[in-house]
A protein has these predicted regions:
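A short, compositionally biased
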Residues: 11-17, 83
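Auxiliary tRNA-acceptor-end handling modules of aminoacyl-tRNA synthetases
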Residues: 30-51, 63, 67, 72-82, ...
Length: 218
């Protein structure tokens, strides 16, 4: 559906990221096999905005591992929503400071400019466990060790793979709007909302609410 979306894009004010095919939501990477009714979804809609955020999260995780290196990271986590973004932490040898955060953000923009394909494949749960063990993603390794389903969907950018539940954008070129801010013991990746999908809102965290969320997720 990617080519068809490209042909219709100029009719839409925001980026098309998903498509309803005969009423069923699909990713743009799927192939059209027969005549059907299509309805495109943009980043200006809630489900489209969530898909965009999922893509930025994946881009961020890859940028962190690219910048710091797998062997120096004990754990990289996206915790919960803060303001208009997600609070994240990196556990490992490297000290998180403004210089490192700027390098991570620069790597994200670099990959967005490269418009790398985001591919999906279905793997056996055992393979997913081994993959996350190799990457040092201990929380995801534990998650899949006790999952009862036999297969899971894994997304990849080049050779880097990760698991996300939900729909994904077809390539990194869609992921143009984000900003990283140092915050508390980690940082926040700030992203647009559906109402203004090309505008990154200013970072205005509610500190009391943040500390309540932080305590509740320990």
């Amino acid at each position: 559906y990617l080519q068809i979306a490209g042909e219709y894009q100029e009719r839409y004010p925001h980026d098309i990221v998903l498509v309803y095919v005969n009423g069923k939501l699909q990713e743009l990477g799927k192939k059209l096999k027969k005549d059907c009714a299509l309805h495109f979804v943009t980043t200006g809609e809630t489900i489209g905005n969530l898909t965009y955020r999922r893509g930025v999260s994946f881009l961020l995780v890859k940028a962190v591992y690219d910048t710091i290196g797998h062997d120096k990271i004990e754990q990289m986590r996206i915790h919960f929503s803060v303001d208009k973004g997600y609070y994240c932490t990196i556990k490992g040898e490297q000290k998180l400071d403004q210089e490192l955060l700027a390098r991570i953000e620069e790597r994200m923009h670099e990959m967005a400019d490269m418009d790398l394909s985001i591919r999906k494949r279905s793997v056996h749960t055992d393979e997913a466990v081994e993959m996350f063990r190799k990457y040092g993603m201990k929380d995801k390794e534990r998650l899949f060790r006790y999952r009862r389903v036999s297969t899971v969907n894994i997304y990849s950018i080049n050779e880097f793979e990760d698991y996300y539940y939900g729909y994904m954008v077809p390539s990194t070129g869609y992921l143009k709007y984000f900003k990283l801010y140092l915050y508390d013991e980690g940082f926040v990746v700030q992203m647009p909302e559906a109402a203004e999908p090309e505008k990154i809102p200013p970072f205005q965290p509610q500190n009391k609410l943040f500390h309540v969320l932080k305590e509740s997720t320990r």
